[in-house]
UniProtKB/Swiss-Prot annotation:
PANTHER family the record matches: HISTONE DEACETYLASE 3, HISTONE DEACETYLASE HDAC1-RELATED
Residues annotated as catalytic: H135
Gene source species: Mus musculus (Mouse)
Catalytic activity: N(6)-acetyl-L-lysyl-[histone] + H2O = L-lysyl-[histone] + acetate; N(6)-acetyl-L-lysyl-[protein] + H2O = L-lysyl-[protein] + acetate; N(6)-(2E)-butenoyl-L-lysyl-[protein] + H2O = (2E)-2-butenoate + L-lysyl-[protein]; N(6)-(2-hydroxyisobutanoyl)-L-lysyl-[protein] + H2O = 2-hydroxy-2-methylpropanoate + L-lysyl-[protein]
Lineage, top ranks: Eukaryota, Metazoa, Chordata, Craniata, Vertebrata
Family annotation (SUPFAM superfamilies): Arginase/deacetylase (SSF52768)
Listed InterPro entries: HDAC_PDAC, His_deacetylse, His_deacetylse_1, His_deacetylse_dom, His_deacetylse_dom_sf, Ureohydrolase_dom_sf
Ranges of biased composition (kind: Basic and acidic residues): 388-405, 415-428
Record family assignment: Belongs to the histone deacetylase family. HD type 1 subfamily.
Gene: Hdac3
UniProt region (Disordered), positions on chain: 388-428
Protein name, entry field: Histone deacetylase 3
Means of activity regulation: Inositol tetraphosphate (1D-myo-inositol 1,4,5,6-tetrakisphosphate) promotes the histone deacetylase activity by acting as an intermolecular glue between HDAC3 and NCOR2, thereby promoting its association with the N-Cor complex, a prerequisite for the histone deacetylase activity.
Subunit organization: Interacts with HDAC7 and HDAC9. Interacts with DAXX, KDM4A, HDAC10 and DACH1. Found in a complex with NCOR1 and NCOR2. Component of the N-Cor repressor complex, at least composed of NCOR1, NCOR2, HDAC3, TBL1X, TBL1R, CORO2A and GPS2. Interacts with BCOR, MJD2A/JHDM3A, NRIP1, PRDM6 and SRY. Interacts with BTBD14B. Interacts with GLIS2. Interacts (via the DNA-binding domain) with NR2C1; the interaction recruits phosphorylated NR2C1 to PML bodies for sumoylation. Component of the Notch corepressor complex. Interacts with CBFA2T3 and NKAP.
């Protein structure tokens, strides 16, 4: 039975710019939406122009001082904020750029609205490719992330859902989400990521399992360089199957960071777009309400391909291998296909023995779980949001240029030899 899918897209979210040479490119969201539009996938979803999160919404997780700082700081006044910039870890990886707070408000509002719609059973699946910024902490920015829309979305889901499962397939450990829910059994966090050799953020060892009420409700799958589709699937499907069976979540949040693909500028895995998509399809197969978010992904053309393909899987619509013509068509040269070869020469350092050892440790930890912990009945606060559906029936009639504008920064896609990549001095 086909699911009702809600899709959140803000036409301005792709126009923000972290700065020259910065690997995080919000422009990838405009490319993704353009493909979703030109493949006709929007016809299979309810399309919303999302709510913009307020300071109050953000302070459901973050400290007031930190959010107040994000709202006030700008490139023109940042000299007066030296102490705060250091205190809140804003600077190199997380620069101050024009419209910073507005950018956070837009991607966070979409995740929050997605959670509210799932709570109110308006949809079965909610998609916000602009969200998934999993490194942000209560008191500080981290790893290109300022406001943790995932934590804020999960807090909204917890008003109605006794147990929320969070799954993270970004190449980086979902440290901000893990930290937020480390002491509770209401949220189980499961992160598959590269671990070791000082890889950012340096957390996510198998032995980080949660504490107090949350002991064993935190699960980490530390992987080595070069993991391919087959090895990843060998771990992902049995682990997620067991977790769902033991924990019995009433809602799932899936962070789909695309930096776990081969050929990512900051990544060292070897997943194909199909292999990445298979994880999304597998999570969908449990038929549990699902909030799907973006995350990392720094080879822009492949991020757009990946999230478009995953949108097609979520709406159960087969799409052609040849990309439809769009105003961004030249970005997808030379092949102009949905599934180019993204494999690299990086050797798969995840031996069968290593993967089996991880599996065994994880399954032993899962046996320690209290099956499906229950929650006392409580009063549910009123929803923070009232919102209007964007009637997208006229999307075909509008010219593509009316749907999104190109970013002002000419170097948004590639900055040449000075661009930061994995050899650079910016630690990712």
């Amino acid at each position: 039975m086909a699911k009702t899918v809600a899709y959140f897209y803000d036409p301005d979210v792709g126009n923000f710019h972290y700065g020259a040479g910065h690997p995080m490119k919000p422009h990838r969201l405009a490319l993704t939406h353009s493909l979703v539009l030109h493949y006709g996938l929007y016809k299979k979803m309810i399309v919303f122009k999302p709510y913009q999160a307020s300071q109050h919404d953000m302070c459901r997780f973050h400290s007031e001082d930190y959010i107040d700082f994000l709202q006030r700081v700008s490139p023109t006044n940042m000299q007066g904020f030296t102490k705060s910039l250091n205190a809140f870890n804003v600077g190199d990886d997380c620069p101050v750029f024009p419209g910073l707070f507005e950018f956070c408000s837009r991607y966070t509002g979409a995740s929050l609205q997605g959670a509210t719609q799932l709570n109110n059973k308006i949809c079965d699946i909610a998609i916000n490719w602009a969200g998934g910024l999993h490194h942000a902490k209560k008191f500080e920015a981290s790893g290109f992330c300022y406001v943790n829309d995932i934590v804020i979305g999960i807090l909204e889901l917890l008003k109605y859902h006794p147990r929320v499962l969070y799954i993270d397939i970004d190449i980086h450990h979902g440290d901000g989400v893990q930290e937020a829910f480390y002491l509770t059994d209401r949220v189980m966090t499961v992160s598959f990521h590269k671990y070791g050799n000082y890889f950012f953020p340096g957390t996510g060892d198998m032995y980080e399992v949660g504490a107090e009420s949350g002991r064993y409700y935190c699960l980490n799958v530390p992987l080595r360089d070069g993991i391919d589709d087959q090895s990843y699937k060998h771990l992902f499907q049995p682990v997620i199957s067991q977790v769902v069976d033991f924990y019995q979540p009433t809602c799932i949040v899936l962070q789909c960071g695309a930096d776990s693909l081969g050929c990512d500028r900051l990544g060292c895995f070897n997943l194909s777009i199909r292999g990445h998509g298979e994880c999304v399809e597998y999570v969908k197969s449990f038929n549990i309400p699902l909030l799907v978010l973006g995350g990392g992904g720094y080879t822009v053309r492949n991020v757009a391909r990946c999230w478009t393909y995953e949108t097609s899987l979520l709406v159960e619509e087969a799409i052609s291998e040849e990309l439809p013509y769009s105003e961004y068509f030249e970005y997808f040269a030379p092949d102009f296909t949905l599934h180019p070869d993204v494999s690299t020469r990086i050797e798969n350092q995840n031996s069968r023995q290593y993967l089996d050892q991880i599996r065994q440790t994880i399954f032993e930890n899962l046996k320690m779980l209290n099956h499906a912990p229950s929650v006392q009945i409580h009063d549910v606060p009123a929803d923070l949001l009232t919102y209007d559906r964007t009637d997208e029936a006229d999307a075909e009639e509008r010219g593509p240029e009316e749907n999104y504008s190109r970013p002002e920064a000419p170097n948004e896609f590639y900055d040449g030899d000075h661009d930061n990549d994995k050899e650079s001095d910016v630690e990712i």
